[in-house]
UniProtKB/Swiss-Prot annotation:
Pfam families found in the cross-reference section: Cpn10
InterPro entries: Chaperonin_GroES (IPR020818), Chaperonin_GroES_sf (IPR037124), Chaprnonin_Cpn10_CS (IPR018369), GroES-like_sf (IPR011032)
Designated name of the protein: Co-chaperonin GroES
GO molecular function: ATP binding; metal ion binding; protein folding chaperone; protein-folding chaperone binding; unfolded protein binding
Primary subcellular site in the record, as a coarse category: cytoplasm
Function: Together with the chaperonin GroEL, plays an essential role in assisting protein folding. The GroEL-GroES system forms a nano-cage that allows encapsulation of the non-native substrate proteins and provides a physical environment optimized to promote and accelerate protein folding. GroES binds to the apical surface of the GroEL ring, thereby capping the opening of the GroEL channel.
Family matches, as CDD domains: cpn10
Annotated source species: Streptomyces albus G
Domain of life: Bacteria
């Protein structure tokens, strides 16, 4: 398991990852402020910790994502967790749809 300079003390198991969702847009292109109640849940976040991978046929399968990656994930995937005042998402690696290269 790797963590982003120990930012989070959550150690994911098997093929799970810990993601910190990125903030959704606060305003529209025309400058209108979007209230919290109307915002879509973010589907983009930074990977903070990665589990060791799951076992298949006695071998551990490595994950495609690594700490620091910015990923797109399934809208309803994962479990929201609040730890030390911060909100995180614990996802199965299967819920990651893509890695965003910036």
């Amino acid at each position: 398991m790797t963590t982003a300079s120990s930012k989070v003390a959550i150690k994911p198991l098997e093929d799970r990852i810990v993601v910190q969702p990125l903030d959704a847009e606060q305003t529209t292109a025309s400058g209108l402020v979007i209230p919290d109640t109307a915002k879509e849940k973010p589907q983009e976040g930074v990977v903070l910790a990665v589990g060791p991978g799951r076992f298949e046929n006695g071998e551990r399968l490595p994950l495609d994502v690594k700490t620091g990656d910015v990923v797109l994930y399934s809208k309803y995937g994962g479990t929201e967790v609040k730890y030390n005042g911060e909100e995180y998402l614990v996802l199965s690696a299967r819920d990651v749809l893509a890695i965003i290269e910036k």
